[in-house]
Amino acid sequence: MKRVHVAAAVIRDASGKILIARRADTQHQGGLWEFPGGKVEPGEAVEAALARELQEELGIAVTAARPLIKVQHDYPDKQVLLDVWEVSAFSGEPHGAEGQPLAWVTARELADYEFPAANQPIVAAARLPAQYLITPEGLETPTLLRGMQKAVAQGCKLIQLRAPGGYDPQYRDLAVDAVGLCAGKAQLMLKGPFEWLGDFPSAGWHITAAQPVSYTHLRAHETKANL
């Protein structure tokens, strides 16, 4: 089965909201929401395909864009490669030139819309900030927590709590304090054994090269299920 190459866009307005479009009921994955874009023609550059599709679908001209993520996904009846770019500037007023409904949503609101399975990594990438903090090594716990608190107060939205010394009880205690500090203000990423997943449901998880695992395996640990 030939893989369909698609150029797609995460389009942001001046306030940071993201433009999504609803697929027609008659289309593949019809009725679900998606990030605008379309097929890359043979011999066509991805950036050129993206500009063409956004002009045809939305009536806008892209003036600033950068690569964001590539996603390969296999449906039972179709294989796709999504070449996703983040569009930060454009001219024209976006409208559904093909009759498709549009919506401007915040990154957090993306979770309220139903997307095709192939779009889920794009949703995750779109919700990540452009930069995030990785905590330094060698700091005493009070100093580290004060630094994290200051970063959150200054608008940092994602923090990775480094664990250079291994996953010992001291790191676990620090993680508990860090979760409380970030609650409702920033996303926290932890490192640790998968047995901890269910104890830190609000945190993200940084998986190292030494922890190869499937999504099913992660879900089993998170829900305490047996494989």
What is the predicted role of each segment?
Residues 216-223:
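Conserved small/polar residues in nucleotide/adenosyl-binding loops
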Residues 1-18, 39, 70:
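Conserved N-terminal beta-strand and adjoining loop/helix that marks the start
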